UniProtKB/Swiss-Prot annotation:
Keywords: Cytoplasm, Methyltransferase, rRNA processing, S-adenosyl-L-methionine, Transferase. This is Ribosomal RNA small subunit methyltransferase H. One of its GO terms (cellular component) is cytoplasm. The keyword Transit peptide does not apply.
Amino acid sequence: MEFKHVSVLLDECINALNIKEDGIYVDCTLGGAGHSSEIVKRLSSDGRLIGFDQDKDALKAAGERLKDYKNVTYVHSNFYAIYDVLTDLGIDGVDGILMDLGVSSYQLDNGERGFSYMQDAPLDMRMNRENEFSAYEIVNTYSEEELYRIIKEYGEEKFAKRIASFIVKNREEKNIETTLELVEIIKAAIPAKARREGPHPAKRTFQAIRIEVNKELEIISKTILDGVKKLNKGGRMAIITFHSLEDRIVKNTFKELANPCTCPSEFPVCVCNRKPEVKLISRKPIEASKEELEFNPRSRSAKLRIIEKL
């Protein structure tokens, strides 16, 4: 299957990075290189792009798309290793870092990867297929309490308790092996009236399991902090999120970097001596335009936040 993915907030991201032609830029989520192809177009031969992706299919597709550019370095790794990878590459400072935290259209639409609740496939959901831990292990080995926690916390699913109970009850008879088996169990757990309203009944549970498989939330804050250490003065970091859990982490981490003072509010002057490392470029998140929403409905929930290194 061809790796297709429509880049979200493309113009907004390029503007956010404030690209210098001889700068060094990092795309933490290279994907099909939609954003990166626009970044590298703006670089001279002295500029450089470092592209991370833990999905080998994505790296292969990006390599094909960017084959005419000799100043691109491809890294098969999760972006949480950004500091160590850049250090190993001999890079002390970069001028821009981009993170697009959405699952690519390719991964969602490619049924065999197990991300989709619309197509039957083995329970997988691994971004990096070299990892052994998959959705199958979560669904078939987590306790009812653990399932409830992740579905409630990561899926923000109000029927999390019933869904966890139904999963455990069903797997007593036989292991749950495919996405559509799981979908039917989720549907059975959710009252009929609720199933008829809102998004697909399995959407929130699938999101929760995917986040747990790939440890998506655990690594965001660390990556931001490590990335900022590598940003040159005036360098920008731009992050696109797609749900409230991610956005909250990005917003709060940016806020702490921009206003790290821990002194009580009644203190007349700061005595903790913690200085801001960044400034917020966008106090409110940038969202998709009406035009973008028309041709790319998946951009509806996208939010872009930007900081600049001081």
